[in-house]
Amino acid sequence: MQIVIPMSGFGERFRKVGYKVPKPLIVVEGKPIIHHVIDMFSINDDSFVFICNENHLNNKEYQMEKVIKSYCPQAKIVSIPEHKKGPIFAVLESMDHISLSEPTIVNYCDFTCYWSYEAFKENIFKTNCDGSIPAYRGFHPHTLWNNNYAYLKEKESVVTDIQEKEPFTKDSNNEYASSGTYYFKTGTMMKNYFKRCVDQKLL
């Protein structure tokens, strides 16, 4: 599996409240958030592409490349100019470094979750699906605050719609929310659908 992790944003909310390093480098439970993200997958079996803000990579105080490679030595580090255009833009800017033939997961850089990666892989290969979005619903501690995520509409476990930051109904706890992991059958399929999002101005 090819794991693509966009981490080229600013993290403005965290900087405003006093954090001195980019969000993926904030230490939680003894290690940087980005290490928790890597732990969701298999360092031995997967390939990793980290799409980084060039200013973060060039800042010697952050040691971003060292932090990533100390935990994931085979990581491919891609540097792109800083932007506020989101992860789809970051991935499309980095396509020269991403395999088009491999099954691909795009994963956000600032969370972890409890899941069975092996069960997830077994399901996607068994169903031969073109894409998959791990999702959850019901009460979770983060729902105590107004932190909206990407919400899904589905019918018989097939996604029919998805939208960011806004639930489809007033009862958001009963809607599926994306955890931030997006699987595509191939890098080509990911690229094509990301381009469609841009062309249709869905971002």
Give, region by region, the residue ranges found by the protein language model.
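Short, charged, surface-exposed loops that flank catalytic or proteolytic processing sites
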Residues: D199-L203
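Conserved beta-strand segments of alpha/beta enzyme cores
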Residues: P24, Q74-K76, V158-D161
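Glycine-rich, phosphate-binding/catalytic loops in enzymes
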Residues: V21-P24, K66-V67, K121-F125
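Conserved N-terminal catalytic core of the sugar/cofactor nucleotidyltransferase
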Residues: M1-S8, R13-R15, Y19, V27, ...
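A structural signal for short, well-ordered beta-strand segments and their strand-loop junctions
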Residues: I105-N107, S132-I133
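The conserved acidic donor/metal-binding loop of glycosyltransferases
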Residues: C109-T112
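Conserved core of the sugar-phosphate nucleotidyltransferase
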Residues: Y114-C197
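Flexible, active-site-adjacent loop/turn segments at secondary-structure boundaries
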Residues: E12-R15, K23, T160, Y182
